[in-house]
From Swiss-Prot:
Disulfide bonds: none annotated. GO terms for biological process: post-translational protein targeting to membrane, translocation. Acts as a component of the Sec62/63 complex which is involved in SRP-independent post-translational translocation across the endoplasmic reticulum (ER) and functions together with the Sec61 complex and bip1 in a channel-forming translocon complex. A cycle of assembly and disassembly of Sec62/63 complex from sec61 may govern the activity of the translocon. sec66 is required to attach or retain sec72 in the sec63 complex. The gene is sec66. The lineage of its organism: Eukaryota, Fungi, Dikarya, Ascomycota, Taphrinomycotina. Residues 1-3 are lumenal. This is Translocation protein sec66.
């Protein structure tokens, strides 16, 4: 009687473990099909806006499509710049053994996705206006630089307040030290 239960328990455990492994494999495959750029950077709203404008019925105006494409290209360039900075840090971590192969593979996929995105932007720009693919990235780079300058300018008033306070404290300390030196010099001369 005991001998009949042992094979049944064995088969049940075997089938359960096979089911668990197959479920794990299917789940991991579903996660890999998701674009890596969404995991890394979040959703690309400018790309979504551009594609929604393309699919509008009646079609959107060319100027609106071009503006949306410039926004999409600007976001693509921002992501590319972040990837370049991250690549250097990732290489340092890789040399030290601080990251695994999975992260390296994901980062490689992310770089390829970004390159494909930029190539698609260039093709789309050329289809909207022939020859525009050569100038769109220059325009986007200027937009990014302009945003950097504006962020620096926006931080200037905050810096002015802190610099002004520091200057006032240093001025008081300097005047006190100067007064002390003046008194000491007068004592040495015998004036006091």
């Amino acid at each position: 009687m005991v001998s009949i239960y042992v094979p049944l328990i064995y088969i049940t455990i075997l089938m359960g473990s096979m089911y668990g492994v197959s479920r794990f494999v299917r789940k991991s495959k579903n996660q890999e099909s998701k674009p890596v750029s969404e995991e890394w950077f979040g959703e690309n709203y400018s790309r979504n806006i551009f594609f929604s404008l393309l699919q509008q019925n009646p079609p959107a105006e060319d100027t609106l499509l071009k503006a949306a494409l410039v926004l999409r290209a600007t976001e693509g360039l921002r992501r590319l710049m972040k990837l370049k900075v991250s690549r250097m840090a990732l290489n340092n971590l890789l040399n030290r053994g601080g990251v695994g192969d999975e992260l390296i593979r994901k980062f490689g996929r992310l770089e390829k996705e970004t390159e494909l995105e930029l190539m698609d932007i260039a093709k789309t720009a050329n289809s909207l206006q022939p020859g525009w693919n050569q100038f769109i990235f220059q325009t986007c780079n200027e937009i990014i630089e302009n945003e950097k300058i504006h962020s620096i300018i926006d931080n200037i008033p905050k810096d002015i307040d802190s610099i002004s306070q520091r200057w006032q404290t240093e001025k008081i300390l300097y005047e006190a030290a100067d007064e002390e030196l003046r008194i000491q010099a007068q004592k040495e001369l015998g004036v006091l």
